[in-house]
């Protein structure tokens, strides 16, 4: 199984907010929607792109104009297009879809159940915090979740600032039935240490 498919994007920086990439993206996503559906999967990731001096409203409009040209086909094939929320403070400077409020507005304007946001807990803790309330207020727009510890993007245990049992409970209480993917970078160097860290993370998230 695959919780999230990729490969249609150009890059994180060259995304749907820039119209000069629309023709390439439309072709790529049309092809990959077929690949994903034919393989029996459901989710396909996308990215906003960098601002490059662009204001939020222009970016929203451009994303809507481009994504509307593939969403109908995604609906027909039963594929969910998901834009990842990434922090622009540390890891992906200048990335446009760096706040829930911007991403949620994009979802509202597209008005499709086949377009949602990939809520990366690590990234959103860095850029906006208020994780649990944000999830409770906007869960209907989130189709996938990523984990990692803050700071450092390492294990999600008590070596970092987020209390994952409460966050996972909020996700579960929202009625979410999709995937939560462990995306942290283990601090251990040996394979056994990495497997141990993953098992611990799964246990932490088993509420």
Which sequence ranges carry the predicted segments?
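Active-site acidic/histidine proton-transfer and metal-coordination neighborhood
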Residues: 13-116, 126
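Active-site-proximal loop/turn and secondary-structure-junction residues that shape catalytic pockets
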Residues: 6-11, 50-52, 85-89, 121-123, ...
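Histidine-acidic metal/acid-base catalytic patches
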Residues: 31, 40-42, 80, 97-119, ...
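Generic structural signal for short, solvent-exposed loop/turn connectors between secondary structure elements
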Residues: 9, 57-59, 207
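Short, structured active-site "lid" loops
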Residues: 1-5
């Amino acid at each position: 199984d695959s919780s999230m498919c990729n490969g249609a994007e150009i890059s994180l920086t060259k995304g749907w907010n820039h119209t000069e990439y629309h023709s390439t993206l439309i072709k790529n996503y049309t092809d990959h929607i077929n690949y994903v559906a034919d393989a029996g999967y459901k989710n396909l990731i996308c990215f906003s792109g960098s601002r490059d001096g662009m204001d939020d409203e222009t970016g929203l409009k451009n994303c809507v104009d481009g994504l509307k040209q593939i969403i109908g086909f995604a609906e027909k094939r039963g594929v969910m297009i998901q834009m990842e929320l990434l922090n622009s403070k540390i890891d992906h400077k200048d990335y446009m879809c760096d706040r829930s409020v911007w991403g949620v507005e994009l979802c509202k304007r597209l008005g499709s159940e086949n377009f949602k946001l990939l809520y990366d807990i690590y990234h959103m803790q860095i850029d906006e915090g208020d994780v649990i309330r944000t999830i409770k207020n906007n869960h209907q727009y989130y189709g996938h979740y990523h984990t990692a510890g803050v700071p450092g993007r390492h294990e999600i245990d008590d070596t970092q600032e987020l209390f994952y049992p409460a966050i996972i409970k909020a996700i579960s209480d929202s009625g979410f039935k999709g995937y939560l993917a462990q995306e942290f970078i283990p601090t251990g160097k040996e394979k056994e240490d990495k497997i141990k860290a993953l098992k611990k993370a799964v246990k932490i998230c088993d509420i």
